[in-house]
């Protein structure tokens, strides 16, 4: 439906902002890499395409191919038409017959196939309780604490709902390739990223710092979450977690890098990494928002 398309597109647009705020994996095997290294690591580790630059095929780990025009169906159609099945599963179900009789098809083949294509915002059909459609927010990291993860989800949902009513007017101002570039730039630079951000008043592309974009949007999120039926006492502490992270400019990635730099003054790299991880585990277990970590 158009409602799904608008919300999904809005979610795609704001995902780079949340990735930048939530970045939490700045090192791998002792090396300093991207602020959210998990994103390029997963993409490269799953990419088994032949190295043919003249005849490229779509990556199975993908931010997306374009803005959604009509609804979820085109995302499922893309999955079927652009990617070969990895795990064959042929059921005896006649999905159309089940539908004609008022039932909910299981769609075993589609669901298994969709599970082998890793869109960072992945649409999922589930036949449970008469069938439902959901979006997996796969781009956001685990940690640093449970409250940080809840805050990331509140930020993503609130921002997407905020931009949903005007998303069709905004899309001509940001080609999808720019949004994809935003996603990887956010993963690379974290809160220091400058992203291309659309405006109905622009006459050329404009790049803005992540904090600058969010400072104007975050005050509008509570009204959106209230309108969706969320309880103010539940979500306002989460919004405050995001605001504090914005004020301190400290997310999980920044804390890890800063802590490593401090520890490296007194010990070798390996010992510093172990000590940093131990402190991370203590803070995470105490469910302290990362903006308050010392």
Question: What is each model feature region?
Answer:
Residues 104-117, 123-132, 140-154, 158-294:
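Acidic, glycine-enriched catalytic cores built around paired aspartates
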Residues 1-134, 138-141, 170-174:
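Loop-rich catalytic cores of soluble enzymes, especially ATP-dependent carboxylate-amine ligases
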């Amino acid at each position: 439906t158009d409602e799904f398309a608008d919300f999904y597109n809005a979610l795609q647009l704001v995902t780079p902002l949340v990735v930048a705020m939530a970045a939490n994996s700045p090192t791998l095997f002792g090396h300093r890499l991207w602020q959210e290294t998990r994103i390029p690591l997963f993409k490269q580790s799953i990419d088994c395409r032949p190295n043919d630059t003249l005849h490229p095929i779509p990556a199975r780990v993908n931010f997306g191919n374009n803005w959604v025009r009509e609804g979820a169906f085109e995302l499922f159609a893309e999955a079927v038409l652009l990617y070969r099945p990895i795990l064959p599963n042929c059921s005896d179900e006649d999905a159309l017959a089940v539908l004609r009789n008022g039932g909910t098809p299981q769609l075993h083949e589609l669901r298994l196939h969709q599970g082998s294509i890793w869109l960072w915002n992945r649409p999922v059909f589930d036949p449970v309780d008469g069938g439902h459609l959901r979006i997996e927010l796969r781009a956001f990291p685990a940690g640093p604490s449970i409250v940080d993860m809840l805050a990331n989800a509140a930020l993503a949902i609130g921002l997407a709902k905020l931009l949903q009513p005007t998303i069709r007017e905004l899309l001509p101002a940001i080609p999808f390739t720019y949004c994809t570039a935003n996603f990887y730039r956010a993963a690379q630079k974290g809160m220091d990223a400058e992203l291309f951000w659309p405006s109905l008043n622009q006459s050329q592309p404009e790049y803005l710092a992540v904090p600058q974009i969010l400072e104007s949007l975050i005050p509008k999120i509570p009204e959106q979450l209230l309108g969706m039926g969320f309880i103010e006492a539940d979500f306002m502490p989460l919004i405050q977690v995001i605001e504090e992270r914005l004020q301190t400019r400290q997310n999980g990635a920044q804390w890890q890098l800063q802590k490593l730099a401090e520890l490296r003054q007194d010990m070798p790299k390996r010992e510093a990494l172990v000590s940093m991880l131990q402190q991370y585990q203590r803070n995470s277990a105490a469910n302290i928002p990362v903006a308050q970590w010392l």
